[in-house]
Amino acid sequence: MASLRIVFMGTPDFSVPSLQALHDQGFDIAAVYSQPDKQRGRGKKVSFSPVKEKALELGIPVLQPDTLRDEQVVAELAAFQPDVIIVIAYGKILPKAVLDIPKYGCLNVHGSLLPKYRGAAPIQYAVKDGEAVSGVTIMLLDEGMDTGAILKKAEIKLDPKETTGSLFDKLSVLGAQALTDVLAHIEEYERNACPQDESQATYTAKIDKETAQIDWTQDAIVIERLIRTLDPHPGAYTWLDGKRLKVWSADVVDGAGAEPGTIIAVTKKNFTVQTGSGALCVREVQPESRKRMQTAQFLQGISLQPGDVLTRE
């Protein structure tokens, strides 16, 4: 059904492959809605969202209202007469007045296998919890938070060293593929829409800066997952000699019974830190005010010895 008239709502990189796929397959994209521009950096330079940049590149009109609860904004949206509204990480809640506009409703691409991992950080939580499988869900939006009927799920296996960044990229492409399939057969998918099992629902919350500080009393497996969860942003960190040190890659190894946070081994290529259970061999770090680097490079410029301690602030 390439003749479907679509309004697309999205903001970050995750949404871009879907917008590109809809354009490539000839869907009629009447308009793109994205979050208002932000000022970034010391110079307060205006920064466009990735979705806005892609829409402008494709020649699609872009609207950036502060709210969707204004009657004039809703009327302007309704004037596009969309058959369906696609919502992918837009960043705003759609009121009922908007949900009721399109013939086929509002479709969302969510970065988990719902009803598991509803909320703001499904991709991060899949990595943090050590999931072997993740995926995307195409659902019909309702007034709840990720509670709508499911149209399609698509699964993917996680690599043992999967990071939030790598899974984000994979799921953004998988989501685009699943979305275009649903839109091509939308009436069939909506006839077979499946309500979510509320008894299986779990929720995620945004991961804050406090979560990013490594607690060496935790198990090595838990810390290693946290490191991958916070890659590429904001990065898990610890403190060495009063300076912040981000840890980007580590392997779980046997511990030595030392106090958590104690460095128990140092080689030319890496160093090993005792945790609450087991230890972590640190492979990649980022010293304060410097770029990411292999631990071998970091060790060339510092005298690190067994018995030194990594701390919390």
Model regions: which residues?
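Conserved beta-strand segments of alpha/beta enzyme cores
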Residues: 28, 59-61, 105
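A residue-level signal for conserved active-site and pocket-lining positions in enzyme catalytic cores
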Residues: 10, 32, 55, 85, ...
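Short beta->alpha connector loops
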Residues: 11-14, 66-69, 90-92, 253
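N-terminal Rossmann-like dinucleotide-binding module
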Residues: 1-42
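An anion-binding loop in the catalytic cleft
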Residues: 217-313
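N-terminal glycine-/serine-/threonine-rich beta1-alpha1-beta2 phosphate-ribose binding loop
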Residues: 39-81
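Donor/substrate-binding cores of folate-linked one-carbon enzymes
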Residues: 25, 35, 84-203, 208-210
